[in-house]
């Protein structure tokens, strides 16, 4: 059994990417290669300098790492769809039986790949169906779980049934992560990242799409991915720091809801969740950026109104 470890990178922080590769170099399980998609437009001289930095490292893993760039592959550096395009590209390039998805700001312990493979074998055999192994995502070197969106016991957002190892795990793993997904290549290729849900919640949408293909989602508290996220202020974390972020956030709310939720959840979204989110984000804007809070709230309401009209008319545009 061989694993394709795939990762997207802006390729603008070589030390961060090197840290990620070092954590892979220490893996006990060795039958894998690494595909890194460089999400930027390299000139030939820039690419040469970039590659020299990694080739000069005394790491065995470099011999099993392939960097996809705009110069050596059909990758389009002028794409409009951010992470979704990059992730579809890297999944399409994976060659082996299993795929492990990472971001370049992740690190893992030496047993991570071995544990993922073992858990996949056990739970696929027990349930006799396709399954996806999902880790716990930790913020830097802390005990703060940073997984995305879902609470296991929150009906409003817990659309997928998360299959947990033990009932106590629901208190340890409150949410699941799009970082660190592991499964067979044939399973992960059953769905694609939605290139309209491009920058916010694209991992969540992808995992939900797998679930809708009758794939079981297994979350493990003992599978730990460390997320070395750059420093962000509160409004960047909420994705309302700029006009374009507010636009994409409002768009994704409606796209995601229309795509995945049932009628009961749709009513909860419109009458409970959406109003609460608007109030909460407006409060954040006033507290954390009082000089520009009015503009932020105006952006939110403007785009919520526009996406409501367009999506309900099935006229979603991509500009």
What are these regions (language model features)?
Residues 99:
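Short aromatic/hydrophobic "clamp" motif used to bind/position activated sugar donors
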Residues 220-240, 253-256:
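Active-site donor/metal-binding and catalytic loop motifs
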Residues 111-150:
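Conserved donor NDP-sugar-binding/catalytic core segment of glycosyltransferases
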Residues 72-94:
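Glycine-rich, basic loop-to-helix element that forms the pyrophosphate-binding segment
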Residues 175-183, 187-191, 197-223:
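A short, conserved alpha-helix in the catalytic core of glycosyltransferases
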Residues 22-31:
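Short, acidic, metal-binding catalytic loop of nucleotide-sugar glycosyltransferases
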Residues 243-252, 263-319:
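Non-catalytic, C-terminal membrane-associated alpha-helical segments of glycosyltransferases
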Residues 152-173:
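Short, flexible, basic/aromatic active-site loop/helix in glycosyltransferases
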